[in-house]
Structure formats: structure tokens, C-alpha cells
Swiss-Prot record:
SUPFAM superfamilies documented for this protein: Tetraspanin
Entry protein name: Uroplakin-1b
Role noted for this protein: Component of the asymmetric unit membrane (AUM); a highly specialized biomembrane elaborated by terminally differentiated urothelial cells. May play an important role in normal bladder epithelial physiology, possibly in regulating membrane permeability of superficial umbrella cells or in stabilizing the apical membrane through AUM/cytoskeletal interactions.
Superkingdom: Eukaryota
Record GO biological process: epithelial cell differentiation; response to bacterium
Compartments where found: Membrane
């Protein structure tokens, strides 16, 4: 293939453009995954306590892949401009490895969405919230994390329990073992607070008088951010894979036509 052929130059330009897009997508993927692993909603302790934080693992992989895509796109552009078979061969080998990692990241993130169920967080809350008798230090760490996260959620987002305050009445829980039902029908954080973060009317809150306690559950506030992040990592990654596949295919064709 002659290097001064106008058709070749046009094809080189298309491949370079394709790799510029790949590099930009890599930067965007890294930024998205950094935002996710920074845990803006501070929900990681709830996932850690389930012993399944694979969605964060998928995001860490996505961050690594994004950086690699940017670097490899630069390498590919250099190889295309120089029509260098060795550079492009090195690019192919590394890109296949990175591509496989991104496939794993997308699959992991997409499948985790079904993991965020109501029963999962309900069981965890009942078992770990204010559980002062953990069997191991690891359980103590997880119990403290779950308790602090739930206290913050209920105060900050004006919700109570997973489905509502009735969760604390219907089911056996560590909270019920530690607290008297008459004094603590549900945690104090379920009460409507004044500016000093004190219950507006504690007795009315205990009796369940509307307007003095939060009747809304917290499930949507937990699963919503997790679902959005899972779909973001999965589907943006999948879109990048689709684009990269065709760019990679075109580059392989170009490589096969370079003269020795």
C-alpha cells in the first residue's frame, strides 16, 4: 500500500479520528468511575456489609480501562501516522487485554442491578442496625458503618426504615432487642426534627401522629443512586466497546495492508 495514495491518507484520517473519540471516551469513563468510587451518597458501608461490593470493583476496573484507552489511542495514532507495523502490533496486544477487562466491568455492573433488592437492605438493617453484640471485630466494624449510614440517611433525607416505620414493628431486629418498644417504637432519627436536631414533639412521634414522624421508607434513596451508577458504568462502557470494536477492526485491516 503506497503511503502517498490519497485513499490511504483518507483511511488514515478516519482511523485517527476514531482513535481520538476512543481516547476522549476513555477520559470520560475514568471521570465517571472516579465520581462513582468517591461515593458521593456515602452508601458504601451498606454494600460492604452485604459482602458484595462488586459494583465498586467494576468501577475501579472501568477507571483503569479509561486511562488505558486514552494511552492506547495515542499509541495507535502514532502507529497509523508512521505506518509502523510493530507499534500497531503492540497496540493490538494491549488493546485486546484492555478490551477483555472492560467487558468484565460492563457485565459485572449490569448484573449487580438485580442485587439491590428491598429484602437485602431490610434484612441487613434489622440484623446490623444498633447491634451491640457482634461476634467478631469485622462484624462490629460493619454494624457501626450500617448504623451511622442509616442514622445519616433518616436524618438527612427525612425517611424511616427501608419500607417505612412499620419495619421496626413488624420484624424482629437488633434494634428491638436493645430498646423498649414503648420508648422506641422506631429510631429517634425517624422523628421530625427542629432546627436543633431535636424531635419536634417526641411523644407525638412515638404515637405515630402524622406530621411528627417520617412515614416514607428510604429504599428508593438507597437503590436509586446505586442503580444509576451501575447502569452508567455498564452502558457507557458497552457503548465504548461497540465503537472501539469497529475502530480496532479498521486498524487491523490497515495493519494488514502495510508493506513490510
Amino acid at each position: 500500500m503506497a503511503k502517498d495514495d490519497s485513499t490511504v491518507r483518507c483511511f488514515q484520517g478516519l482511523l485517527i479520528f476514531g482513535h481520538v473519540i476512543v481516547g476522549m471516551c476513555g477520559i470520560a469513563l475514568t471521570a465517571e468511575c472516579i465520581f462513582f468510587v468517591s461515593d458521593q451518597h456515602s452508601l458504601y458501608p451498606l454494600l460492604e456489609a452485604t459482602n458484595n461490593d462488586d459494583i465498586f470493583g467494576a468501577a475501579w476496573i472501568g477507571m483503569f480501562v479509561g486511562i488505558c484507552l486514552f494511552c492506547l489511542s495515542v499509541l495507535a495514532i502514532v502507529g497509523i501516522m508512521k505506518s509502523n507495523r510493530k507499534i500497531l502490533l503492540a497496540y493490538f496486544i494491549m488493546m485486546f487485554i484492555v478490551y477483555g477487562f472492560e467487558v468484565a466491568s460492563c457485565i459485572t455492573a449490569a448484573t449487580q442491578r438485580d442485587f439491590f433488592t428491598t429484602n437485602l437492605f431490610l434484612k441487613q438493617m434489622l440484623m446490623r442496625y444498633q447491634n451491640n453484640s457482634p461476634p467478631t471485630n469485622d462484624d462490629e466494624w460493619k454494624n457501626n458503618g450500617v448504623t451511622k449510614t442509616w442514622d445519616r440517611l433518616m436524618l438527612q433525607d427525612h425517611c424511616c426504615g427501608v419500607n417505612g416505620p412499620s419495619d421496626w414493628q413488624k420484624y424482629t431486629s437488633a434494634f428491638r432487642v436493645e430498646n423498649n418498644d414503648a420508648d422506641y417504637p422506631w429510631p429517634r432519627q425517624c422523628c421530625v426534627m427542629d432546627k436543633l436536631k431535636e424531635p419536634l414533639n417526641l411523644d407525638a412521634c412515638k404515637l405515630g401522629v402524622p406530621g411528627y414522624y417520617h412515614s416514607q421508607g428510604c429504599y428508593e434513596l438507597i437503590s436509586g443512586p446505586m442503580d444509576r451508577h451501575a447502569w452508567g458504568v455498564a452502558w457507557f462502557g458497552f457503548a465504548i466497546l461497540c465503537w472501539t470494536f469497529w475502530v480496532l477492526l479498521g486498524t487491523m485491516f490497515y495493519w494488514s495492508r502495510i508493506e513490510y
